[in-house]
From Swiss-Prot:
A Gene Ontology BP annotation from the UniProt entry: ATP synthesis coupled electron transport
Transmembrane segments: 4-24, 35-55, 87-107, 113-130, 134-154, 167-187, 211-231, 242-262, 272-292, 305-325, 330-350, 386-406, 416-436, 462-482
Protein name listed in UniProt: NAD(P)H-quinone oxidoreductase chain 4, chloroplastic
PANTHER family linked to this entry: NAD(P)H-QUINONE OXIDOREDUCTASE CHAIN 4, CHLOROPLASTIC, NADH-UBIQUINONE OXIDOREDUCTASE CHAIN 4
Coiled-coil ranges per UniProt: none
Broad class of where this protein is predominantly found: plastid
Enzyme Commission number(s) from the entry: 7.1.1.-
Organism expressing this protein natively: Lobularia maritima (Sweet alyssum)
The organism's taxonomic lineage, starting at the top: Eukaryota, Viridiplantae, Streptophyta, Embryophyta, Tracheophyta
GO CC aspect terms: chloroplast thylakoid membrane
Amino acid sequence: MNDFPWLTIIVVFPISAGSLMLFLPHRGNKVNKWYTICISILELLLTTYAFCYNFKMDDPLIQLSEDYKWINFFDFYWRLGIDGLSIGTILLTGFITTLATLAAFPVTRNSRLFHFLMLAMYSGQIGLFSSRDLLLFFIMWELELIPVYLLLSMWGGKKRLYSATKFILYTAGSSIFLLIGVLGISLYGSNEPTLNLELLANQSYPVTLEILLYIGFLIAFAVKLPIIPFHTWLPDTHGEAHYSTCMLLAGILLKMGAYGLVRINMELLPHAHSMFSPWLMVVGTIQIIYAASTSPGQRNLKKRIAYSSVSHMGFIIIGIGSITDPGLNGAILQIISHGFIGAALFFLAGTSYDRIRLGYLDEMGGMAISIPKIFTMFTILSMASLALPGMSGFVAELIVFFGIITSQKYFLISKILIIFVMAIGMILTPIYLLSMSRQMFYGYKLINVKNFSFFDSGPRELFLSISILLPIIGIGIYPDFVLSLASDKVESILSNYFYG
C-alpha cells in the first residue's frame, strides 16, 4: 500500500480543474485554451514524476496501490494501482491529450465546454487504465462515453449528430454485455461478491460459464477496439469529428478495447481465451486484409485514415491471440505505436483541412508546393504507418510475426497461412497510404484554382508534429524502452497458459 495517493490525484485532478473552468467568469477563449494546456502539462509531469520515483520495472505485481472503502452499502471500493500493462497506456494518454488540447486551438465556438470535456475524458481514461476493481473499471468505461458523445455531436462536420448517435448506440449497447460480465464474475462462487481484480485472477470457473463471460467481455471490447464486423461506427465518427477529438479517439479510445481484452479476457479467463484464440487470429488476419482493401475506396481523407487504424488493430488482435511472449509484447508495442501514428495522421489531415476546406481526396491535388512542411510531415508519418524500418510500427509488426512463428499452439501450415495473408495486407497498406499522399500533394488540381494561396504550418503545428514524430522514431530505434515496462507482467499473464 502506498502512503501518498498518487493515482487518486492523477485521476481526479483533470476533471476537478476542468470543472473549475466552468464556474469561473468568462475571460475569453485564449484564457480557457492556455488554462487547459497548463492543466494537461501539469498532469503529464505529475504522472511522469510519480511513475519515475515509485514504479519498479522488475516487479510484475500491482504498484502504487490504493484501496479505500467507497460505498458501504454496496461494499464498493475505490481500488487503483498500476503494473507494466497499464503504465504505458497511462503515459500515452497524458502525452496525446496534452497535444490534442494544443491542437484544439482553432476551436472558438463554446470553447470552455469543449476544453472541459477534453479534461473529463482525460480523467475517465486514466481512471480506466489504473482501476483495480471491476465495477470501477465499468464505471470509468461508461463515464468516458459522455464527454466523447458531446465532443462528437457538438463540434465537427455536417453529419456529426448522425455519427455521434451511431457511436453511442454501438458503445452503450455493447456496455450491457460488459455489465452482465462484471456482475456474472463478481457473483459467482463466493458467499460475498468480490470485484477485486487481483482476487479474481486466481479464481476458476466452470467451462460453460467462462465461455459465456468471455463472449460478453469480447463483444464489449470488440466494439471499442474495433473488431470487424463491429467497426462501422469508426469511419463515420472519424469522418465527422473535429481533428483534436480524432486524435483522442485514434490515440487512446481504441486502445481501451485492446487493454480490456488483455486485462480481463486474457488475465481472468485463461481457459476460454485459449479456446477462442484461434478465432482471434483468423479475425485479426481478415481484418488486416479487409480494412486495407476497403481503404482505397474511401473518398473522404479522414475515413481512409480510419480504415488504416482498423487494419493496424488487426495486428493487436493477432498478437493477443498468439498467446506467446513476443506476440503479446508486440501487441502492447503496437498499442503504443499506433497511438502516436494514428493521432499524428489525423492531426495533419485536420491542419490541411483548415487551410483548403476540402475533405475529399478527389478534390485535392498539388498541395505540396504551397505547404511543404505539412507535406514533409505527412509523408514521414505515412511511412511510419506503413511500418517503415526505423519507425515504431515496423518493430511492433515484426515482433507480432515472431509471436506467430514461435507459438506452440498452432500447426505449421496454419502459421504459414496466417503469415501469408498478413503479408498481403502489409503489401496493400503502402498502396492506399501512398495513393492518398499522391492524391493530396501531387498533380496540379488546386494550383489551377483562382486565388489559390494558403499558409504553411505555423510554429504550433510544427512543434506538435515533431513532438509526436520523436517518440515514433525513438521507439523504432530503441523498442526495449517500452518492452521492458511490460515484459514481467506479460510473463506473469502467460504463466496461466500451458504452452508458449
